[in-house]
């Protein structure tokens, strides 16, 4: 049997077996500019087909679609988990040169280095968490 078919069969089998307990906690939608492709309507429809109990929306550095996502999930009987994927770096954005480059570990190129930019997924546990995340994103 072809390897890709085995992988696909395994994934579908896993999802079918665990559909009531599997939740995507890192998902970009149309609101992750240049990165997310799925439209909310299509996401909700597919989630209903798979029978997932909840979905997180973690678009890059924004919550532009949070209200629409929350409303559509609730209407479909899916628990919405609001969040965002943020970036953080050492230093302050107000300090010139604060964004330092760091050598890439394991790189063959002695000159290769990358900015120290890290990604972090933040999920809202409740309304207070939502308010805090909104404040954080507004200040960033």
Name each model-derived stretch.
Residues 2-140:
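Phosphodiester-processing cores and adjacent nucleic acid-binding clamps
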């Amino acid at each position: 049997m072809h390897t890709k078919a085995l992988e696909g069969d395994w994934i579908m089998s896993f999802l079918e077996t665990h559909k009531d307990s599997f939740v995507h906690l890192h998902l970009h939608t149309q609101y992750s500019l240049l990165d997310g492709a799925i439209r909310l309507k299509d996401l909700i429809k597919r989630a209903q087909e798979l029978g997932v109990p909840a979905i997180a929306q973690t678009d890059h550095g924004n919550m532009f679609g949070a209200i629409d996502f929350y409303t559509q999930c609730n209407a479909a009987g899916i628990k919405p988990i609001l969040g965002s994927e943020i970036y953080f770096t050492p230093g302050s954005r107000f300090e010139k040169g604060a964004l330092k480059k760091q050598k890439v570990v394991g790189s063959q190129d002695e000159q290769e280095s990358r900015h120290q930019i890290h990604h972090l997924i933040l999920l809202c546990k409740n309304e207070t968490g939502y308010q805090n995340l909104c404040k954080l994103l507004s200040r960033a």
